[in-house]
Amino acid sequence: MEAAAAGRGGFQQPGLQKTLEQFHLSSMSSLGGPAVSRRAGQEAYKKESAKEAGAATVPAPVPTAAEPPPVLHLPAIQPPPPVLPGPFFMPSDRSTERCETVLEGETISCFVVGGEKRLCLPQILNSVLRDFSLQQINSVCDELHIYCSRCTADQLEILKVMGILPFSAPSCGLITKTDAERLCNALLYGGAYPPPCKKELAASLALGLELSERSVRVYHECFGKCKGLLVPELYSSPSAACIQCLDCRLMYPPHKFVVHSHKALENRTCHWGFDSANWRAYILLSQDYTGKEEQARLGRCLDDVKEKFDYANKYKRRVPRVSEPPASIRPKTDDTSSQSPASSEKDKQSTWLRTLAGSSNKSLGCTHPRQRLSAFRPWSPAVSASEKETSPHLPALIRDSFYSYKSFETAVAPNVALAPPTQQKVVNSPPCTTVVSRAPEPLTTCIQPRKRKLTLDTAGAPDMLTPVAAAEEDKDSEAEVEVESREEFTSSLSSLSSPSFTSSSSAKDLSSPGMHAPPVVAPDAAAHVDAPSGLEAELEHLRQALEGGLDTKEAKEKFLHEVVKMRVKQEEKLTAALQAKRTLHQELEFLRVAKKEKLREATEAKRNLRKEIERLRAENEKKMKEANESRVRLKRELEQARQVRVCDKGCEAGRLRAKYSAQVEDLQAKLQHAEADREQLRADLLREREAREHLEKVVRELQEQLRPRPRPEHPGGESNAELGP
């Protein structure tokens, strides 16, 4: 019965086993890529299978008469050798989410495609590289093997609507942030070595800096290895030059030092994901301090420098990882596995799963000296034997698979050559063919935790592994919360453009009532195992269905039917999501066009107001100029009058005296003439008086002569009266 149970638990459909192995081999988060992880996993799997097969062939001791007859344990049927997986296809990321980044102090528009920023090349040429000719730029691109991709129609339309490109632009090139950093560094800061100087002086300065206790030897592995001397006291600002290159003896800021290199420029390497702002992850302590007393002190000093001016709090001190569980726990696990042959058989069947997770754990834990803590280490095909032999534990398996899932979700080919836009081709295929060819895609996010729920034969194992999980999670929480937060942020950027966002709902179809796969977990075992949730529960349902419900042809056909149904539902959900996304993009474009029109109107009104203000300002300036000229003229006249007054102040009294004397003389002459006229008039009056008196006298005489003499008679009296006057 026990052997039969073991044989039943070890049976899996070859096609499904191949699919699962292909997924796990393709989803490794390693700089070496799936090829290195696949080779390491296969060799470790073969080695452990050979060990267990040798242990199973050891002859049993001869039983005595008192002992019961031994039970013959037949070795379980070994699964077929792993088949090399084919290429892993992913839909191209055509993200149209525009954002901005800073390159050499200039703000550049870009699109986040597959987690890598693609910058607008014309904007870089017109701002950062405006002092260089196209011939120089093309020659440097050919030397560095930099190729630019062509933006899609949606991206080109967005750049036109936002005013970054003219509406007549037929196309636009996009360059990755990594290649843009390389290109700008080669053009702006290329030139390698300083002008020649006295060798004795340069050697003495370099030797003095190296022998100083205040300097730390560091290096980086970006675009070729480069060594330098870090002087922490010189790091007084984010852009302070505090690292001296040991090759050219020039000082560089940290974010420029990580791009600086002299020897192997790695021009034929496909670079991806570089950002000079993350220099804290690229600058490492020199290997010369390995095993020395000052290694810990200088490491803390380097961490202090990295924590300075870290306003975003992205850098956190690394906590050392424990590569193996405690010695007091391992014997219990070994005893438990030796007591339950069925559980050891299941562990052997999932060896490739643990081995691949262990390889991912190595890439994150960096416990091997050849795999140092480097965020930008070039891939090397040489894999040491110690790296292939792994003994991972459960907490690291869960954490690293989460990192693998998050990082693989946003993976995309980093660089493509500039080529004309390709047209999408629609190929109609039967549902079964779709399931076979695209099987890894719905499982991309379904097998996230890689935590296997134990069955009835291994009910005691969770009791031993749970304390290890708690202890390891406490130790790794500080070091891995940064990785998880970064990967969640990166995956959220491309969640709309990746079909994996529907995997959770599609994977839930495996637990539908149509499966009829009862769980094989005992109540006592379920009490000790934490209740899985989300993708972990879906993975357990899938594994239970594979282990317990696929022993007949009808069950297999039913399972395939459910998988086809799940695939159809996933395609429907994906189509609906893409349609909704397309509608939202159209609305967004409409809003952007309307906003652009309003912005254009506001710009026109602003331009008119500016013209009116300029006109009023010109008139005001003209009036002010005239007023100033008038003021200057009046001031000049006043100064002239004042100067004349000051100059003539001495002779003014004489001139006035002469003037007044002349006037007095004139008046005196006039007075004399008036006196003469007066005398003449007086004389004339006297003559007239005399003449009048003479005339009166003559008249009187005549009157007397003419007066008649008086007569005594009356008639004579009348005549006298008549003659009287």
From Swiss-Prot:
Q: Where is the composition biased (Polar residues)?
A: 14-30
Biological process per Gene Ontology, one example term: negative regulation of transcription by RNA polymerase II
- Region of interest called Disordered, as start-end residue ranges on this chain: 1-77, 319-352, 457-521, 697-725
CDD domains per record: DHD_Ski
Pfam families for the chain:
c-SKI_SMAD_bind, Ski_Sno_DHD
Q: Where is the composition biased (Low complexity)?
A: 490-506
Q: Where is the composition biased (Pro residues)?
A: 60-77
GO MF, one term, reads: identical protein binding
Q: Give the UniProt keywords, A-Z.
A: Coiled coil, Nucleus, Phosphoprotein, Proto-oncogene, Repeat, Ubl conjugation
Sites of Phosphoserine modification: S380, S429, S477
Signal peptide positions are none
Composition bias type Basic and acidic residues, residue spans:
40-51, 697-716
Q: What cellular-component terms does GO give this entry?
A: centrosome; cytoplasm; nuclear body; nucleoplasm; nucleus; PML body; protein-containing complex; transcription regulator complex
In this entry, which stretches build a coiled coil? 534-708
- State where composition is biased (Acidic residues): 471-482
Q: Which family does it belong to?
A: Belongs to the SKI family.
Q: How does it assemble?
A: Interacts with SMAD2, SMAD3 and SMAD4. Interacts with HIPK2. Part of a complex with HIPK2 and SMAD1/2/3. Interacts with PRDM16 and SMAD3; the interaction with PRDM16 promotes the recruitment SMAD3-HDAC1 complex on the promoter of TGF-beta target genes.
Biological role: May play a role in terminal differentiation of skeletal muscle cells but not in the determination of cells to the myogenic lineage. Functions as a repressor of TGF-beta signaling.
Q: What is this protein called?
A: Ski oncogene
Q: Which organism is it from?
A: Mus musculus
As recorded in Swiss-Prot or TrEMBL, the protein's gene is named Ski
